[in-house]
């Protein structure tokens, strides 16, 4: 059996497992009736399948109808895309056609939410600036590779981060190119040990934003599924998905941080 066949079989088995779990005991929650599409693929070093296996069952237990795909062609189905409440993408260093990208962007602009983590959303399609504009940022570097670093929550009142403490990760500390029109919920500070000239640089780690009528949630951690063994990391991403899907009680529209606004005064 070739690798493509194996990947396709894995996707089918994963989707079936989630559907069985969902059908067995689907609670009546604020998310009941909402649909989420997980799309995974790209560079396998980011463990996209394992990460999807973390979150797909969690959303099913929240009442979502869950669909899982390994094909960006799913974005071509306009009727399907508009029926969704949320797209969760885990595709690093992929290639997307103009038609696939348009299908995704049109859906988000019309009000479908989008969420993701690490390179699966912020390093997906390096040749597509409009996609990066939609997401609100893109990966630039991870100085030092896998290191220990701290994530500091900056807004403890937001429903996505409420009640959660700062936490440490052993993962890639992403250095990002970030849209100032995002609302930042958590940051990290670079020590400069790998690159001395960035010592003290404070970088967004978690943000939310709008693209048209659609809500976008991004977390820059999640290099591997092990990152989500950290309870705060897993909970932030789960809550971010609920927010992007407009689940009641998950929070309102973002208030952009815009760190440069004081320069215009």
PLM regions and their residue ranges:
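Bacterial N-terminal signal peptides
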Residues: 11-21
């Amino acid at each position: 059996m070739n690798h493509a066949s194996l990947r396709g079989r894995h996707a089918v088995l994963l989707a079936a497992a989630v559907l069985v779990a969902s059908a067995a005991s689907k609670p009546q929650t604020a998310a009941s009736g909402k649909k989420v599409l997980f799309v995974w693929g790209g560079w396998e070093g980011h463990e996209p399948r394992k990460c999807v296996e973390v979150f797909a069952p969690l959303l099913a237990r929240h009442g979502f109808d869950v669909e899982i795909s390994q094909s960006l062609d799913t974005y071509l189905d306009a009727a399907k895309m508009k029926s969704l409440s949320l797209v969760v993408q885990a595709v690093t260093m992929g290639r997307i056609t103009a038609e696939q990208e348009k299908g995704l962007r049109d859906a988000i602009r019309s009000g479908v939410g989008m969420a993701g983590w690490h390179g699966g959303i912020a390093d997906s399609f390096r040749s597509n600036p409009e996609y990066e504009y939609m997401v609100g940022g893109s990966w630039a570097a991870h100085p030092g590779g896998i290191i220990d670093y701290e994530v500091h929550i900056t807004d403890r009142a937001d429903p996505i981060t409420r009640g959660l403490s700062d936490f440490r990760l052993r993962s890639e500390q992403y250095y990002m190119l970030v849209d100032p029109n995002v609302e930042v919920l958590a940051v990290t500070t670079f020590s400069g040990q790998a690159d001395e000239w960035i010592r003290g640089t404070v970088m967004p780690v978690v943000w939310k934003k709008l693209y048209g009528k659609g809500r976008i949630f991004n977390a820059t951690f999640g290099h591997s599924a092990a990152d989500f063994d950290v309870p705060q990391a897993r909970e932030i991403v789960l809550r971010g998905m609920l927010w992007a899907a407009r689940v009641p009680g998950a929070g309102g529209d973002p208030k952009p941080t815009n760190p440069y606004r004081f320069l215009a005064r």
